[in-house]
Amino acid sequence: MQSFTKEVVLAAASGHYNEIATRFLPMLSLAVSRPGRHVPDPFRAGSKDGFRVFKDFNIKGKMIFNQAFGETNKVMDVWELMDTLGISKNFNDALEQVGSFLGCERTGFHIKGTSYQPIDKKRQEEALAAAKQAAAKVEAEAKKAEEERYSKGEAAIQKQLAMTIPLTVKDPRCKPVFDYFENRGLGMLKYAPESLFKDLRYSPRTPYFENGKVTGYYDALVSIVHSNNKVWSLHRIFLLNGQKAPVSSAKKVMTPKFDGKDTSRFIRLGDVPEHGIIGIAEGIETALSCFCGTRLPVWSAISATFLEEFTPPKNVKAVIIFADKDKSEVGQKSAEILRKRLLEKGIKAWVCLPKSEIPQGSHGIDWNDELKQKGVFGFPDPIKLFEFITDKLQKK
């Protein structure tokens, strides 16, 4: 009996990996129904977001595990996972199984030890229809669970907001946050305009949850995360005695009120000025450091991923991207992705990196490090920077 060739089966599989996964790897069904989004790792108990299939999974069949098989950020494809789990004996065996499932034409030589029979067109269509039906059921269940999750997220956000007070240096109750700023080299924020803190709040005695249980109560800097001109979530930094709290995750983003995957998510730190120039950075402390160094409003994208997706308001004409300098170059690459996106939208954009070298033994350096080491002299001269950008805008 002839076998399936690699070229024939791979060509047939492209565009059908959703059905293939549903048939041979049903544990991936939730992830397959939500391509590109983090879901619990199907092989690691307690994981909440340790796995995802890539957005083009149906075409390429690739996925990524945060932790799997002794590796970090392990990228695998359907074929490797079938082999790892023992669903197939080897790659050729997987080709036989998938080729039969897809009803591929046998054009190669017989492979010793395999005995799968090709299925006819009718059986192929029935199998694919059944797989699609199963995937649709999983997707419907996932959507329902997601709606419930967002509903709970909204309730928790409202409860947290009710515990907060507006952040202002005039209110002595906010001292724990300004003590934290002082320890991060941001003491000059005591003299910043009130508009800078419009979306920042202070929360006393904030419960900290670990694995669903309250393990302590801390002061917290609470920041409103916006998406599509709406409150999407809250970002919290838990504090103790002017430092980050001694917990496993001192920074946490609460379960959001809605999806927000197709929109930009960020923390506003100041209003857009009339000249339309703002900055964007990853972390809150980094963004506030850039404000101290340049006097421009610099917003926080929270993470490198959100930085790539940042879309400024319509009245923004130019954006300075204050990137982190990482050994892995994640920060630099994300900043460059954003710069190109903004240019395509007709928005002037530049990437600005710290000049200091990454210290030995460190993973990277950011603009807060630069501020602590060099003060405002570690930043581009504000007047020259403004003149440079306005000149570029006039030549548009």
Model regions and ranges:
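Conserved active-site segments centered on acidic
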Residues: L95-T168
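Amphipathic alpha-helical segments that form well-ordered structural scaffolds
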Residues: I20, P176-G187, S233, S289
